[in-house]
């Protein structure tokens, strides 16, 4: 083997090592970005302190947000959440066989945005929620109103319908400060 060939082997190894390190860095940055996005989207159960801090800026109650979304379809779930670092009131609606996410302005009650639900997990959840609401005789806004009346000082931050032994119920998350309370209201 010539001296030039012998010298080029360590150089090739150094180039390959630098390439591998650069590739690992790109993967690490991508994973960090994904984790940050997940952390910015949180529910009351995940980060009650963040939601408790942001909730006072909302003058629209969850049941009012559900009512406001009715022009886009039948509300099948709703929640306050921290999305991209900001408070957001999100309501899933159903019109025919189409599902949408309606973003309600938490200060005015006006509809800010409506988007068709296309994400597979979100679509699966919407279908399950619509099945529960198909046999419901009580609307979600009424269930939320009843839950908040029965729990003085608490504010509803989410409502998710489900079937419990074949009967429709609303699982409602309430908050008072950072205190999180879960209640169930019958929908039949």
Place the predicted regions along the sequence by residue:
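Long, terminal "pre-/pro-" and other extracytoplasmic accessory regions
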Residues: 2-188
